[in-house]
C-alpha cells in the first residue's frame, strides 16, 4: 500500500527513518520498487538480532546508494541530507554487536567526528536535514518529551548524545533546518497519553518525531488509512510540517499540522 500511495501523492523525496523490517530482506527489497528518490537509515529493530552482522550487511547491499549512515547526500543540488548513526536504540550512546561487526568498535567521540567530517561537504546556501533513527539528547527528560523514556521509571532523556553534540557543533557554522527521527512512539506506555512530536530550539532548528505507531488504521467503515509525515520547503525554508493519514486513493483523510 505504501508504494501505491507514494506514487499518488508524489513527494520529491522519501526519507525512511528506520525500524522497517526486523531484518527481513524481503521487505527491504520493496524500497527499491519506489520510483521516487529515497534515503534510508536503519533502526535498532533492523539489526535482525544477528551478532555476526550478516543480516545488516545484506540489507545495506540491497539498499545500495539509498543506504545512509554517517554521511552526507546532496539531493538534486536542492537540499543537504546528513545521516546519523545507524541502528541506534537511544539511551545516550550504545553500539550493538551487529553494528560493531559491520563498522568496528566506534566510540562516541569517533561517531561525532564522522558526523562532522561528513557535514563539511554540505552546500551552505541549501537547507540541511539531519535524519536519524533515534533523536538527540537534550530535548527533555519527561516521559512525554520528544525523546523521553516512558516505559519504566526512572523517566529520563533517552536521546543520542553523539547526535546532540554533532548538532551543537554544526550549529556554530550554519543552520540545521530539520532533524527528523522516529524510534520513540507517539503513544506512551502505561496509558500516559501521547508524546510531544515537535520542537524548535533556540537556533531555529526544527525537531520532528515521525514515529506514529501503528502506521495503519481503519475507520468505522473498514477503510484503510496509512500515516506519513509530510514536510514542505519553499524557497529553502520550511513552510509546512504535518502528520497525515492517507486513504488508499491518496486523499488526506486526517492531518495534524505541526508547523
Where are these regions (language model features)?
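Beta-strand-turn-beta hairpins that frame and shape the catalytic cleft
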Residues: 69-91, 123-129, 199-206, 236-240
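Binuclear metal-dependent hydrolase catalytic cores centered on His/Asp/Glu-rich metal-binding motifs
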Residues: 76-127, 153-159
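N-terminal active-site segment of His-dependent metallophosphoesterases
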Residues: 1-34, 47-49
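Active-site-proximal segments of metal-dependent phosphoesterases and phosphodiesterases across multiple
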Residues: 126-175
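Active-site environment of divalent metal-dependent phosphoester hydrolases
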Residues: 1, 21-25, 45-52, 88-94, ...
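Active-site neighborhood of phospho(di)ester-bond hydrolases with catalytic His/Asp-centered motifs
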Residues: 14-19, 38-45, 129-132, 158, ...
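Binuclear metal-dependent phosphoesterase catalytic core
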Residues: 72-75, 169, 175, 186-259
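Glycine/small-residue-rich loop that forms an oxyanion/phosphate-binding "nest" at active or ligand-binding sites
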Residues: 50-72
Amino acid at each position: 500500500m505504501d508504494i501505491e500511495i507514494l506514487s499518488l501523492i508524489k513527494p520529491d523525496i522519501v526519507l525512511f527513518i528506520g525500524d522497517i523490517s526486523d531484518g527481513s530482506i524481503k521487505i527491504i527489497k520493496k524500497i527499491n520498487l519506489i520510483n521516487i528518490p529515497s534515503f534510508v537509515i536503519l533502526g535498532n529493530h533492523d539489526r535482525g538480532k544477528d551478532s555476526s552482522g550478516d543480516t545488516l550487511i545484506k540489507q545495506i547491499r540491497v539498499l545500495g546508494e539509498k543506504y545512509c549512515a554517517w554521511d552526507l547526500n546532496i539531493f538534486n543540488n536542492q537540499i543537504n541530507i546528513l545521516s546519523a548513526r545507524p541502528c541506534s536504540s537511544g539511551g545516550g550512546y550504545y553500539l550493538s554487536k551487529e553494528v560493531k561487526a559491520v563498522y568496528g568498535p566506534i566510540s562516541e567521540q569517533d561517531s561525532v567526528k564522522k558526523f562532522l567530517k561528513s557535514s563539511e561537504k554540505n552546500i551552505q546556501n541549501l537547507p540541511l536535514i539531519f535524519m536519524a533513527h533515534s533523536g538527540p539528547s537534550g530535548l527533555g527528560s519527561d516521559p512525554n518529551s520528544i525523546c523521553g523514556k516512558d516505559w519504566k521509571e526512572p523517566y529520563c532523556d533517552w536521546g543520542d548524545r553523539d547526535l546532540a553534540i554533532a548538532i551543537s557543533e554544526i550549529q556554530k557554522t550554519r543552520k540545521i533546518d530539520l532533524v527528523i527521527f522516529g524510534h520513540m512512539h507517539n503513544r506512551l506506555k502505561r496509558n500516559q497519553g501521547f508524546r510531544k512530536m515537535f520542537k524548535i530550539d533556540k537556533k531555529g532548528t526544527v525537531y520532528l518525531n515521525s514515529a506514529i505507531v501503528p502506521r495503519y488504521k481503519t475507520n468505522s467503515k473498514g477503510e484503510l488509512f496509512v500515516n506519513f509525515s509530510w514536510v514542505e520547503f519553499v524557497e529553502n525554508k520550511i513552510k509546512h510540517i504535518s502528520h497525515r493519514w492517507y486513504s488508499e486513493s491518496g486523499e488526506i483523510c486526517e492531518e495534524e499540522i505541526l508547523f
